[in-house]
């Protein structure tokens, strides 16, 4: 029997809403005429969409669409011009927030709970700490001062609201600074560290420390793994179900009298320990954050015992330039900020985010050129990196340029 009108309309709408062309961004490209192309360029409108989704998490505006349809989005220089314009728009903050969520692994802050012993912890505080890190990241990247990666990692200031000045015991100079791009009105750039309670950069933000911890105690393993994987791009295997036939015990929830979290974890890296093969790459870095409890608050004692934040960068097969001991949190982060390996990793994380995939051999030349631009004059300019990514062959083509030969 034929469909009645409502049933027919329902079928049409269902067909539209379940179509791959509605659900996905499809990129067919425009293969050059004749022969087998080494790369398939995106069409101008496809490139405009990819550019807008990466920099704005939104659709192209009229200016970008007009540039695409008018033949002004055809070269790397054209794309760089549009990218520079788009980064000056407040909409750029949304994409940077999404990147920060994934890079620092903090997107699930709304699910973080802590033991009731932490009487100041609440869902509202977790949300504020989360927003602090997102706003600090986007404001640092978009600042007119053209900040570098080192500024992000070593700054003594963060974007906090009045509640967070209490969490950080910040000076009373709150609200003297102006807001940055895309910053909510009540989040201001404020010094969050002091001589008695030091903080350095985004890795010591409360959100980063709290989410990489347990409900009651800090976790040198989680925090060290975060640095190893997210900041150094060095993989550590997931824990096995058992070691030597013995099931992995759950992490400690209490500390015996006179001991610290560190003393509970040191057996992981003890000589001849069956756990040391993996934990030696994580825990000694995580010890560098031991002055911060499970909520990310600064502490000097744990269980009545002084806390030590000394640690070691154990040589990893994937690392070339960062090994040896550090004397505490700020020394550890200073070493990270001075490491070319960290700069390369951050550039690689942006490339992966922009392409929506892990890099392949065919991306080698693009990655090399992107890093060369990023490291110009040792500036490691965060905005310049984004422009370099979008004007690369890998970004502008559906199928990247074959990197089998020498890079130009």
Name each region found by the language model.
Residues 355-358:
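Axial heme c-ligation environment in periplasmic c-type cytochrome domains
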Residues 1-341, 347-348, 352, 365-377, ...:
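Active-site substrate-binding loop specific to GH73 endo-beta-N-acetylglucosaminidase modules
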